[in-house]
Amino acid sequence: FEHIKIGRQDFFDKQIEEWEFEVKKWKEEGENGKKPKKPRPLSRPDVPNGDHEERKWNIPENWIWTQIGELCFVTKLAGFEYTDYVTYVEDGDLPVLKAENAQRNGFKITDFSKVHSESVKMLTRSQIFGGELLIVFVGNVGNVAMVPYNQRYFLGPNVGMARPYFKLDSKYLELFLQSGVGRSLLMSAAKATSQPSLSMGTIRQAPVAFPSLEEQRQIVQEIESRLSVCDKVEGSITESLEKA
C-alpha cells in the first residue's frame, strides 16, 4: 500500500511540475490563449460494493486487494473536447484510438482516423504513449487492451483510458481484466440496462488482485508461454483440416 501511495504522489508532483512549466511558457509568450489549468488532486475511487466483495477470493499473503483507480489515472475524452478540438484529417500525424481497437483478446490495429498533433496538444490527458489500458465503456463494454509501446496515439471517443501512476506490468493488468474473474469484477458495477455501460467512476472502483512487480512479470511470462503453445496447437489443427 505504501508503494502505491508514493507512486500516486510522484505522479501528481510530476503533473504540477509540468503545469508550472506550461504556465511559465504561457507568460513568456504574452499570455496568449487560456491559462493552463492547474491539475486537480488525484481522486480516490469509491470503496468496492457488495457485489465486488462477493466476487473476491483468497489471495496469497504477499498480494493485496486494490482498485483500478488506486493504480491508474482513469479518464476519457470529454464531449466538448471532441466537439471543439478534434477534426479527423487524412494527412494527420497522430492516430486516434477508439473502442474498436480494444477487442476481447487485446489490442487490434485498424485503419486509424488521424488528427494533427498540434491541434490537440492542449488535451494532455488524452495523449497516449504506450502501456496504457483501453477500457470500453459503451458498446462492447468491458473489453480491455494494452496500448503497444513505441507509438504515440490520441484517445478518441467512447473508450476509457487507464494510465498507471507508477511502474507496474500493464500486461498483467490487461490479462487480469480480460480473465473471467477480472472481467466479472469490472462489470459488476455496470449499469444494468438493455445496453450496459460503465462510468469512469465504476471503472476506478473495480478491485484488482495485485502482486509484486516481479510476480506480475512471472505471471505474464507463464500465461504468454501457455498461450503460445495453444496457438501452435491451433495452427497445427487448422493445417491438418486444410489437408484433409
Regions of interest found by a model, annotated:
Residues 46-79, 205, 209, 213-221, ...:
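Non-catalytic DNA-recognition/assembly elements of restriction-modification systems
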Residues 1-46:
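Extended, domain-scale alpha-helical bundle/helix-rich regions
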Residues 127-129:
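Short, well-ordered loop/turn sites that connect or cap secondary structure elements
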